[in-house]
Curated annotation (Swiss-Prot):
Involved in embryo hatching and implantation. Its EC number is 3.4.21.-. Residues 31-276 form the Peptidase S1 domain. It holds the Pfam family Trypsin. InterPro entries: Peptidase_S1_PA, Peptidase_S1_PA_chymotrypsin, Peptidase_S1A, Trypsin_dom, TRYPSIN_HIS, TRYPSIN_SER. This is Serine protease 29. Disulfide bonds join C62-C78, C158-C234, C191-C215, C224-C252. CDD domains: Tryp_SPc. The gene is Prss29. It comes from Mus musculus (Mouse). Induction: Up-regulated in uterine endometrial glands following the initiation of embryo implantation. By progesterone. Residues 1-17 form the signal peptide. It is an enzyme of class 3 (hydrolase). One of its GO terms (biological process) is proteolysis. Keywords: Disulfide bond, Glycoprotein, Hydrolase, Protease, Secreted, Serine protease, Signal.
Length: 279
């Protein structure tokens, strides 16, 4: 099911990038303007699954990133319910192809950021604790978290990955291989200006791009439906660093509408606190 989410805060008609898929054959899974990722290139990428009784199948719902052998960071809007039952989720790790292969991993704990209400209001992050450690799994490796002082700019080499739709109206075709695309970081003030100019009177006087958000994308290259919760990584001093979590945007890869991400840097204290508390 492809859900066009209208953010009531600013009446945009903007879309959440990751939503439950309709079924294993028609699943809205690709990155707009990207290409297939080699096996093992992005070893922290995971697929967050929910069970569809109609098909008796665990379908792709969102992306996520392994940040510790037993912890996954994703978007809060992928979880939806603050008291979500961990047993309704499964995690797929270490595979470029969405279906087939390894067994799915169980989730033992779900933690949504306490300030989350809606993706457009910020705090769009959640943690999933895995029932088992993936320390010894092949093609699996945690991604590096940013330092509190890290500043990423348009000069940095950044990529976003996922199994989301390859255009606003076209799902990723079989064999459902992980997609990757290089995107440009866009300064928050410029991103704010772009959204305001493109939507004009619909958001007059309302701040759209908050401090805990990050913008990235190019016309024709972006994350899309089914990518939510997935990683935006930048090559910082030779190491891939997780700087963003796919959150929301207006359509996919449209001119003047960059993708909007949860800024991982803003949530470092919360992430560290939760992992220490429950590990």
């Amino acid at each position: 099911m492809l859900i066009q989410l209208c953010l009531t805060l600013f009446f945009l008609g903007c879309s959440i990038a990751g939503t439950p898929a309709p079924g294993p054959e028609d699943v809205l899974m690709g990155i707009v303007g990207g290409h297939s990722a080699p096996q093992g290139k992005w070893p922290w990428q995971v697929s967050l699954r929910i069970y569809r009784y109609y098909w008796a199948f665990w379908v792709h719902n969102c992306g996520g990133s392994i940040i510790h052998p037993q912890w996954v960071l994703t978007a809060a809007h992928c979880i939806r319910e603050r008291d979500a039952d961990p047993s309704v989720f499964r995690i797929r790790v270490g595979e470029a192809y969405l279906y087939g292969g390894k067994e799915l991993l169980s989730v033992s704990r779900v933690i949504i950021h306490p300030d989350f209400v809606h993706a457009g209001l910020g705090s769009d992050v959640a943690l999933l604790q895995l029932a088992v450690s993936v320390q010894s799994f092949p093609n699996v490796k945690p991604v590096k978290l940013p330092s509190e002082s890290l500043e990423v700019t348009k000069k940095d080499v950044c990529w976003v990955t996922g199994w989301g739709a390859v255009s606003t109206h076209r799902s990723l075709p079989p064999p459902y291989r992980l997609q990757q695309v290089q995107v440009k970081i866009i300064d928050n003030s410029l991103c704010e200006e772009m959204y305001h100019n493109a939507t004009r009177h619909r958001n007059r006087g309302q701040k759209l791009i908050l401090k805990d958000m990050l913008c990235a994308g190019n016309q024709g290259q972006d994350s899309c439906y089914g990518d939510s919760g997935g990683p935006l990584v930048c090559n910082v001093t030779g190491s891939w660093t997780l700087v963003g979590v796919v959150s929301w945007g207006y359509g996919c890869a449209l001119r003047d509408f960059p993708g909007v991400y949860a800024r991982v840097q803003s949530f470092l204290p919360w992430i560290t606190q939760q992992m220490q508390r429950f590990s």
